[in-house]
Amino acid sequence: LTMRSIYMDYYNQLNKIEGNASRYVPVYELYDSNRSFEPLVQNYFEQYLGQFPAQVFDKINENFIRCSFYELVSRYLSHCYTFAIEQNNSVGRSDFEMIGIPGTDYYTDDRVVEFKYYRSKDADRMLALTEPLVEHVEQVKGYAADTKRKFPNYHVRSYIVYICANKGWKCWEV
């Protein structure tokens, strides 16, 4: 157990956020066959964040998004990935990284994710975008390039995820 997981468990209990596996397991079972990252984000937004009352979304922040996504994904994919939050590298800190475990079919699969959280007042503007902001693309591509330099045999994929309060989400592979 880490302090982060203890905090998230406490937060979920305090706010009666349901951790019922039936909300999540089908998506993670499907991930085993298609390895598509976007449905993980969709499931997180709809099934986890969807339980929160609207007023919470003006109080949470990017750190909460990053930590709660980590807590959920690591619960169901820790048999095939290791996870890092705020992973240090030569160009900064990536928000979230999942690295395939040696000896599994996931070995050399690396996903680098940059999360951006927007409150209600900015949500519609961000949801109208057809592509992520250039500075976010440059940021996550820098993290991915650094990982690729360190681990040249890895297949590194990078993503930008916008969580726009309780109004919606966007996920791009860049």
Task: Annotate the PLM regions.
Residues L1-M126, E131-H136, A144:
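Extended alpha-helical interface modules used as scaffolds for assembling large macromolecular complexes
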